[in-house]
């Protein structure tokens, strides 16, 4: 694999149409170093944490497992294996409701006495040597097998199985690997802290991913309000040929459809994917996980979660085992403040309201945001005034109010005519709507109905 000459940290001055500039609120947790959560007494590892088929358990009650042991698998074309995130004894199978409302089975594990804790755990995941200049690249097949065995999924929120994304397609050759370090969702800083504190596994993982898809170019996109992170990545990438580029700080800059044109000049087709224009996109945390899976044979068992908002006492960035409860992470951040009014799985733009603090963290959980009463706009919904603000804000040039109102009326063919499935649910339209119409919720409802029709 021969990469293009590096351009260092450069700036892309173009921007995309639409989008918004909500208050970032990242200052709440941005300067908080990653902390390792003490091993909980119990984790519940969901058997569906990804796009695709549900895994079947491969362990039973009373089995002893070690951290990293396989506990669920599926032979379906689209799925991702799941692994024990702590060492201990398997308890009786239970179920949990995920933030998106789906009820899924879990593998509960009661913690044993022997666990890695604190700095030792952090170093096991992100520390040590991560070769870049003298990286002995495995074959593409070996990289894909390692990624599949490790159960890797996109950690930016989509949770699409990574081994499928990296699978070569002779009909669609890949020119560029884009590594997404934008983290444009307000409040969340997990990726920022990872880029700042552990940039080398990100660079190593990017080199491995590019080798798997035979990309000649690697570009890391970072919003221009994260200069320290970009500098850390640039230093780690020295002499590798990897470019680190600033893009405008604007929501939703981290969306593939917005990021790919900014970094490559190629527009992703309306009903297509980045690979249609020779691009594969991976999140920075996913890149680090690829390095760990391929070079160390370690599966995805932990992730960094930002616990933030004015509704928590001490916002933090926490390295936590998959399957720990949201409530335990909130307690690790000092608990809820007295004026906490709403808890979100994720951030305020694309997150889901959390109804149960016992909900387990999954591979795609990037943050927990606790909002106060002052954060919430208590304005009643009124009729659409046809102001067009939602249209101006939509980064995909859709007409959100028409889609949402068609869904509300059950006019499904009309909703499809207005391209309901093209909507990425970024929330720009709802943020701008002066009538407080729940545009995103209506569109989600419409998609759910059409998916089950």
Where are these regions (language model features)?
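Ferredoxin-type iron-sulfur electron-transfer modules in oxidoreductases and energy-metabolism complexes
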Residues: 365-381, 389-391, 395-453
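Hydrophobic alpha-helical positions that pack around
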Residues: 215-326, 332-339, 347
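Acidic low-complexity segments
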Residues: 97-160, 171, 227
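Conserved hydrophobic positions within beta-strands
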Residues: 88-90
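Short hydrophobic beta/alpha edge segments that flank linear recognition/processing sites
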Residues: 65-79, 94, 104-111
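Gly-rich Lys/Arg/Thr-decorated short loops/hinges at beta-loop-alpha junctions or inter-strand turns
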Residues: 177-191, 311
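Short histidine-centered loop motifs in beta-beta connectors
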Residues: 55-64, 68
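N-terminal, Lys/Arg-enriched amphipathic/low-complexity engagement segments
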Residues: 1-58
């Amino acid at each position: 694999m021969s990469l293009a000459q590096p351009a260092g940290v450069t700036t892309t001055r173009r921007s995309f149409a639409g989008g918004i500039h909500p208050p970032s609120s990242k200052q709440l947790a941005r300067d908080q170093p990653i902390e390792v959560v003490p091993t909980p007494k119990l984790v519940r590892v969901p058997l569906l944490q990804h796009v695709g088929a549900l895994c079947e358990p491969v362990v039973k009650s009373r089995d002893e497992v070690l951290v990293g042991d396989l506990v669920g698998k599926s032979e379906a074309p689209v799925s991702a294996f799941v692994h024990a995130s702590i060492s201990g004894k398997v308890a009786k199978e239970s179920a949990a409701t995920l933030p998106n409302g789906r009820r899924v089975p879990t593998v509960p594990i009661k913690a044993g006495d022997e666990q890695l804790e604190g700095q030792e755990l952090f170093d096991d995941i992100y520390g040590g040597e991560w070769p870049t200049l003298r990286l002995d690249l495995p074959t593409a097949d070996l990289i894909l097998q390692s990624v599949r065995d490790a159960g890797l999924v996109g950690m930016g929120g989509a949770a699409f199985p990574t081994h499928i994304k990296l699978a070569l397609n002779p009909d669609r050759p890949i020119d560029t690997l884009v590594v997404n370090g934008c983290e444009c969702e307000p409040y969340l800083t997990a990726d920022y802290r990872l880029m700042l504190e552990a940039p080398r596994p990100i660079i190593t993982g990017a080199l491995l991913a590019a080798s798997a898809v035979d990309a000649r170019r690697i570009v890391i996109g970072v919003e221009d309000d994260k200069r320290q992170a970009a500098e850390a990545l640039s230093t780690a990438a020295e002499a590798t040929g990897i470019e680190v580029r600033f893009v405008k700080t604007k929501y939703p800059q981290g969306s593939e459809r917005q990021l790919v044109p900014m970094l490559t000049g190629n527009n992703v087709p309306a009903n297509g994917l980045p690979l249609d224009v020779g691009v594969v996109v991976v999140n920075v945390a996913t890149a680090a996980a690829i390095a760990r899976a391929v070079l160390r044979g370690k599966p995805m068992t932990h992730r960094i979660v930002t616990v933030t908002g004015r509704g928590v006492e001490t916002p933090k960035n926490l390295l936590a085992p998959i399957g720990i409860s949201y409530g335990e992470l909130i307690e690790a951040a000092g608990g809820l403040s007295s004026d906490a009014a709403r808890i979100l799985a994720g951030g305020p733009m694309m997150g889901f309201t959390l109804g149960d603090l016992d909900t387990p963290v999954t591979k795609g959980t990037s943050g927990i945001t606790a909002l106060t009463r002052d954060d919430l706009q208590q304005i009643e919904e009124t009729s659409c005034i046809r102001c067009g603000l939602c249209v101006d804000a939509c980064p995909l040039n859709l007409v959100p109010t028409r889609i949402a109102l068609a869904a509300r009326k059950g006019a499904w063919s009309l909703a499809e005519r207005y391209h309901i499935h093209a909507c990425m649910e970024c929330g720009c339209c709802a943020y701008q709507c002066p009538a407080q119409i729940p545009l995103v919720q209506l569109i989600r409802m419409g998609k759910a109905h059409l998916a089950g029709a």
